[in-house]
Amino acid sequence: MRLLFLAVLRPHTGNAVTAQRVRAHLEAAGHVCVLKDAFDFESRSEIANLILAENCEAALALHLYRGGRLLQGHRIPFGVIFGGTDVNEDANQAEKNTVMGRVLEEARFAVAFTESMKEMAQAQWPHAKGKVYVQSQGIATTPNAAFNWNTFLQRSEINQSADNLHIFLLICGLRQVKDPLYLVDAFSAWHQEEPNVHLVIVGPEVDPVFTREVKAKVKRAAGVRLIGEMPQEDLHAVVKNCFAVVNSSVSEGMSAAILEAMDLEVPVLARNIPGNAAVVKHEVTGLLFSNPQEFVHLAKRLVSDPALEKEIVVNGREYVRMYHSWQVERDTYQQLIRKLEGSTED
């Protein structure tokens, strides 16, 4: 089949990585997948023209509101994949909620990353029961073997002997929902006690106004550095070399950065929110914190307790292999896409 796939494709963001992975799964099954950025289109008529021009027989959208609403009413079957903001944010706005409900009426299937996301969706839109499937994100990491860690440290202006360094890595697009400033004050105070600990924030400048605020704050914060977006393979190499990966988001669908850290055998400290608690079991596959002070307490514990670090790393890796298999994800999407075959009158 020729499929139109609409997603939010800001480079080096979780959505873009997910979309590229799903496209690869579908193309491996022999489908042609026309991947387009939902933000490039304003109206359904533009999508109608695109469907005609590309001769698309079916469609898929990552994000019900941003992508799915553009696929309605074209008389081609489509499926949707929930994004984190769909159920965590957009569903709380009456107008968007109604739009997403209509999208689900027309969609042949919907994919949620977690069981709790599925439950939230079915509570919001009871008519979607039976249409929502759970498929967690499949994880495959590809660290750049030629990546130079010392050059990265210099670029981050961290000039110390690399032996006793503890680099905590926060990977996120600079926007408010990711809350990159949540830990900055507490971390900076810790760095002043222990100068070998550093927090490096890596990610694209998504929200220009908020980015200015982040840059201004980080500039004044000892022990905290901000680095722009990086190619996926380089980012995986940075993760592999750092001491721990941190997530301080206000809400998450399913953080690929957390799962990739587990896959690369690096401990994870994550803010205790439903999306993170769905993948991080406290003191088993990672550590969960509820405030900046607790983060520092847990980070200090991790630094001083190699046995805890080892246990978390082993369990995290096992968890990803068991529940986030790339092959299982491939099989699921290749099966679901068959629901789009056949006429729209089925």
From Swiss-Prot:
The keyword Ribonucleoprotein does not apply. It is an enzyme of class 2 (transferase). It is found in: Secreted. Its EC number is 2.4.-.-. Pfam families: Glycos_transf_1. GO terms for cellular component: cytosol; extracellular region. SUPFAM superfamilies: UDP-Glycosyltransferase/glycogen phosphorylase. One of its GO terms (molecular function) is glycosyltransferase activity. Residues 1-16 form the signal peptide. Keywords: Glycosyltransferase, Secreted, Signal, Transferase. InterPro entries: Glyco_trans_1, Glycosyltransferase_G1. It comes from the Eukaryota. Its main location: secreted. Belongs to the glycosyltransferase group 1 family. Glycosyltransferase 4 subfamily. This is Glycosyltransferase 1 domain-containing protein 1.
